[in-house]
Amino acid sequence: MFKLGKRFNRRSFFRAFFGLVLTYIFPWKVKSLTSALPPHHTGDGFRNTDPNFKQADGLDVFNWLISRGTRRSFSKETAEIPSTTFNNILVENVNTNSVTWIGHSTTLVRCEKKLFLTDPVWSETAGPYNLVGAKRYTSETISIEQLPDIDIILISHNHYDHLDLNSVLSFAKNKKTHFFIPLGLKEWFADYGIQNLHEMDWWQEETFGSFKIVCTPAQHFSGRSPFDRNNTLWSSWAVIGKEKRFYFGGDSAYFSGFKQIGEKYGPFQLSLIPIGAYLPRNIMGPVHVDPKEAVQAFLDVNSQMMLPIHWGTFRMADEPIDQPPKDFLAEVEKRGLNWNAVQPFKIGETKIW
C-alpha cells in the first residue's frame, strides 16, 4: 500500500480539500458544439450525449458533500467485506482464462494468454496527493509485487479512484506494458515519462496482436481539479480475442450505450460492470448505475458472466458499503437470472471464465 512520500502543511491540506470539493460541484461549461466535431466532442472538452442525461445540480452536490462530511465524522461503518488469498497459480496459468477482483474497479483478466489490468489503484486514499478524498475501507489482498507481468492496462477515466499515479508509475517500469487510455489523457501520462500509450476515442478500434481493443462509450465525467472538468474523455472498453471477449464498464450511469455496445460487439463471455456509489440518486444517478440498472446493463451488453465492481473498497456514497451486492442479488433473483453467472466476488478471488 502506498503512503504519502512528503510532508504537507495545513495550507496544502485545505487547498487539496477545497479543490476536490469544487471539482464535483461546478459543471464547468465548455464551448459550443460545431458540426465538424463528433457529438460527444465540444470546443474544449467532451460531453455525454444520451438524450436522458441531466447534470446534477451544483448546489445539491455542495449541500450533500457538506452533510456527508458531517455525518461521516460522527459515524463509522463496521461491515466486513469478504476477501480471500490470491490464487497466483491459477492466474499464472497462461492456458486458463481467469478473472480476479483486486478491489473497486481494479481487476486482473487473463484472456487468451495475455494479462489485462483495469483501472489500477493501490493507494490508501483516492484523491489529490493521496491526501484528501475517499479513504480505503478494505485493504487489498494482492500486492503489485505479487502480480505477473501485465501486458495491457485499460484506463476508463481520470478520477482518482480509477487513475492512481503511484500505481501506474509502478506498472510503467515494465517497458513492455501498454496503456490504453481515453482521448485527452496522453499528455498526463507522457508528463510522467510513461510510454506505450494508445489514446483512443469512442468507437475507435485498434489491433493489438491477436486482439481488437475498442474504446466504447460511458456516461460519466472527468476531472482531477476544479479547472479541468470534462477536458479528457471517459470510456468503457471492449476486448475481442479470437475466441474470447470481455467488456470493462469503467464508471457509468445507465444509458442507451450499453445496448449499442452489446449489439455491436457482443456477446461477451465476461463483463466487469459497476454496482456501487449510487445514493443519493439525484446526485449519483446521472453518473453511476444503481444495482438494478447494473443488472440491466449486464443484459444489454449481452454477457454470459459478470464481475460486479466499484463497491466494497472506498466509501464514496450514502449507501452502506456492503449494500450494493445485496441490492444487486435481489434484482437478479427478481428477474430469475442465473445466480452463479453474476455472483459477487470476494476481494482477491479468482474465477475461470
Where are these regions (language model features)?
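Metallo-beta-lactamase
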Residues: 2-133, 140-146, 182-250, 269-276, 327-349, ...
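Cap/insert and terminal regions of metallo-dependent hydrolase folds
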Residues: 30-31, 37-41, 48, 143-144, ...
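Catalytic core of the metallo-beta-lactamase
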Residues: 106-112, 207-269, 285-293
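Divalent metal-coordination and catalytic microenvironments
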Residues: 109, 119, 157, 213, ...
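Active-site metal-binding loops of divalent metal-dependent hydrolases
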Residues: 120-122, 158, 218-219, 250-252, ...
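Acidic/histidine-rich helix-loop elements
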Residues: 122-139, 221-228, 279-288, 315
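Active-site metal-binding motif and surrounding structural segment of the metallo-beta-lactamase
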Residues: 132-181, 196, 266-272
